[in-house]
Amino acid sequence: MQLEPAHLVYAAFWTFGLVNNVLYVVILTAAVDLVGPQTPKAVVLLADVLPSFLIKLAAPFFIHKIPYNRRITLLVGLSTVGMMSVSLASPLFLKLVGVVLASFSSGLGEVTFLQLTHFYDTRALNGWSSGTGGAGLVGSGLFMLLTTVLGVSVKTSLLVFAFFPLAFLGVYFYLLPPRDYNRVPGAFPVHSNDPETGIETQPITWEFVASGYETTMVRLKPLVMPYMLPLFLVYFSEYTINQGVAPTLLFPMEELPFSKFRDVYVTYGTLYQLGVFISRSSAPFVRIRRIMIPSVLQFANLVFCIAQSMSPILPNVWLVFILIFYEGLLGGAAYVNTFLLITEQADLAEREFALGSVGMSDSAGIVLAGLVSLWLEPGLCNYQVNDGRGWCTLE
């Protein structure tokens, strides 16, 4: 039985989203294992997101000059080598180098695949969004299954994920249907001397980048308020919760369904990703057009979680589990609805540029969250220790 091209498009972009984000999720889920309870988990967050943010920040100025097939090959190399380093290296520095390589791959992948959706109908974007949500569930869930349930070592568990990026090659070159290059007039002129992209090939020089700076900034300006600001706020809020507050949302061991405190953190990550997966997959059924609403609700969630850490309001971990799941629902809903609105509202000539550029705002929010969490997590932990609740210092 042969699948229809529309189904192949959805399956291909679902796989792209899954594989591109799964390593990012696993690294954050394993943060407590990589750096231990005494080091702020935001160290891993910054190494995991800052390179990705820099790629997204620079991409609008040059990324259209690199053919898609070369980008895919680069993604596989960076992510595979990165995860090998994370899983096999002993010094923390080398582990963080591996995290940085995987982060570069993740950022390049997000820009690449979001731009690639421009050549297909909305099934591509729906598949990508659902796949990125699935990455969270697969990454955190499989890591929790291997380490917490089955007792597999962290090293071996991380090594398993090093082989995931190979799927990019098979899906892009053999599963994804050919795309339509009948493009509308846009900022990137259509020429025929590059058969893979239809874009004129020329060297990427400093003069080329500088000459396009002002034009690019003008094109970014109308994207800020309706799309980039809400996405920035929701990501800042949820990643501050995940890396700066969640490690301190603990209860006495006898009240927990675990034997180690690190299992609480891993479970929080899995529940968050479950919420993200559900909401990112909900776009065909539920649409949110006022995307500032989930962003503001997420910020309120952050304030509540900080209050919970300082003076417990919720009496047990089960209610905190629900709170973290709700956090994931808000974040996933904001993400998928933002990019769907772009496909509906942006001019066709600007759509590919907008899809590839708005993603820098979520990374900016995560970077700021990491910087805040470097101070926030130790501050909350010290407050709890002085209050007689020193569980955040234990494994």
Curated annotation (Swiss-Prot):
Keywords: Amino-acid transport, Membrane, Signal, Transmembrane, Transmembrane helix, Transport, Vacuole. GO terms for cellular component: fungal-type vacuole; vacuolar membrane; vacuole. It comes from the Eukaryota. The chain crosses the membrane at residues 43-63, 74-94, 96-116, 134-154, 158-178, 222-242, 261-278, 291-311, 313-333, 355-375. GO terms for molecular function: transmembrane transporter activity. The keyword Transmembrane applies. It is found in: Vacuole membrane. Gene3D superfamilies: MFS general substrate transporter like domains. PANTHER family: BATTENIN. Belongs to the battenin family. This is Protein BTN1. It comes from Yarrowia lipolytica (strain CLIB 122 / E 150) (Yeast). The gene is BTN1.
